[in-house]
Regions:
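FMN-binding flavodoxin-like domain, especially the glycine-rich phosphate-binding loop
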Residues: 2-4, 18, 26-30, 35, ...
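Short amphipathic alpha-helix with an adjacent loop that forms part of the alpha/beta core around
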Residues: 42-49
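Glycine-rich NAD(P) Rossmann-fold beta1-alpha1 loop
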Residues: 11-18
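Short loop/edge segments at beta-strand edges and connector loops
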Residues: 38
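Short, contiguous strand/loop micro-motifs
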Residues: 10-11, 59
């Protein structure tokens, strides 16, 4: 039986959602059952039904959206009790000295603000939208 994976995301301009949709496509192709939801809707789910949980969050003006840390705080016990991952999407990750979990300032700052310790961390370069 396939593991059931939750992909919860917080996005500002849709790029993090796009990354999660791609992850969903790949994981489904590998035989995984995947539920993809905005983090605002994840509270309505019974998180105990998921064997694995991944949270993706974008940076806007130097910060992840507050609902990300709030969701993590509310569900800390469940997140800590199973394989879990977190990734940050931010524009500075395009630079080689800021494109890894151990050197991305936004991810490192966020991890200091929460007590959850995901087993897997990731950083993706964000999309910069220029006004037309």
């Amino acid at each position: 039986m396939a593991h059931h994976l939750l992909l919860a995301y917080s996005t500002t301009d849709g790029h993090t959602r796009h990354i999660c949709e791609r992850l969903q496509f790949v994981m489904t192709a590998l035989g995984q059952r995947v539920t993809l939801v905005p983090i605002e809707q994840a509270d309505a789910l019974n998180l105990n039904q998921f064997e694995r949980i991944v949270i993706g969050a974008s940076i806007r003006y130097g910060h992840h959206q507050p609902q990300v840390a709030q969701f993590i705080a509310r569900h800390q016990a469940v997140l800590q009790s199973r394989p879990s991952a977190f990734f940050s999407v931010n524009i500075v990750a395009r630079k080689s000295d800021k494109n890894r979990p151990d050197n991305n300032p936004y991810l490192l700052k966020f991890l200091r603000q929460i007590s959850w310790q995901p087993q897997l961390l990731g950083v993706f370069a964000g999309k910069l939208n220029y006004p037309s």
